[in-house]
């Protein structure tokens, strides 16, 4: 948003009308895997699968909570990689954050993602948690549990491959 506002300000300085300057911005669809919101057969998918840090994961959870949603809000969260010696702590902090920004269901994929569940439980959260061990198991869970009106967030480090689960949802 800040970049778009800066572009509009520069256009204004050069005498370009706001309508003319805004027109290309209206066609901008964002960057693949970075908070792209897609509507698929009655299901809203937030594809934030490209990468993850504690700050960006919390932001994704906030976006999930802010969207209008007729069904369940489901956070599909995978490992955050390359965080250094405080990796476990950072995952647990995301879990504690979920208590204050609840989803209806959390699906965890990866060894480190289990620490998100530990952080949620330690904070006293009672959101239903499901742990999956593979992308295939995640796809099966999605088939069995996602319904019309649901909103899903896919968030994790790129190396976890959540973009494949998003592609699976798009193919359904």
Give names to the regions the model predicted:
Residues 6-172:
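ATP-dependent carboxylate-amine ligase
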